[in-house]
């Protein structure tokens, strides 16, 4: 595994024209943040040694190096999901590579179903903690020496970055929620009973990604900031049939607000 990580990092280092310390993983419907990136170098996942290939509609599958405002960044346009059949090691492989390339801060975004009755479709929820409901753990097996065998997860999402985001949202007049994200394997959307269970467990939103990458980032010593776009509601009386297209539409409508917060945060760290 370590050899593969180093091989991929060496390949990318030879192509890179910048030295980013910040990376972004862009989720469903949020890939258009790439239009803000200047001085771009793009490479398709299929052309990167050892990289899996994303199969989800709306995920274009590219690694992008460039500038967002005045900061060098690395962006993943399209992520890998456990439900696609990848192992957890494959899902999180790009995060290991980020660590090898010198990334210090990771921004993650996703689309999620809200289980909190105070949430509305289109809300941005700053993730302050998560619950890992996946059946497999990304650190299962031999420890990769980027971090300890038993990593601390008491601050999986940086409090400093959360405070900065709240400050920016207030300054820009953007409404944000805060909450706990629960990650499940999918690919089915949740039943009403599952939504109810997740809420009882302490989750405010549920989705099919993010948690594995965040666990690995924490193991590697990378600071994390995460945001969910609430694209459907799993609240009694508000549950309706949901499709991938509707999720995408809600995420696209939230994109300008997400872009503003992400751009400002990256330029202020």
Label each residue range with its predicted role.
Residues 235-269:
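His/Asp/Glu-rich mid-to-C-terminal helical/loop segments that flank catalytic regions of hydrolases
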Residues 99-102, 199, 218:
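Non-catalytic positions within long, well-ordered alpha-helices that form the structural scaffold/packing
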Residues 208-246:
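Zn-dependent metallopeptidase/amidohydrolase metal-coordination segment
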Residues 1-153:
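Metabolite-binding pocket within alpha/beta catalytic cores that recognizes anionic/polar moieties
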Residues 146-157, 183, 195, 250-259, ...:
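Polyanion-binding loop/helix "lid" in catalytic or ligand-binding cores
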Residues 104-105, 204, 223:
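Short acidic/polar active-site loop segments enriched in Thr and Asp
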Residues 162, 167-204, 262, 269:
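Active-site/ligand-binding-proximal alpha/beta "capping" segment
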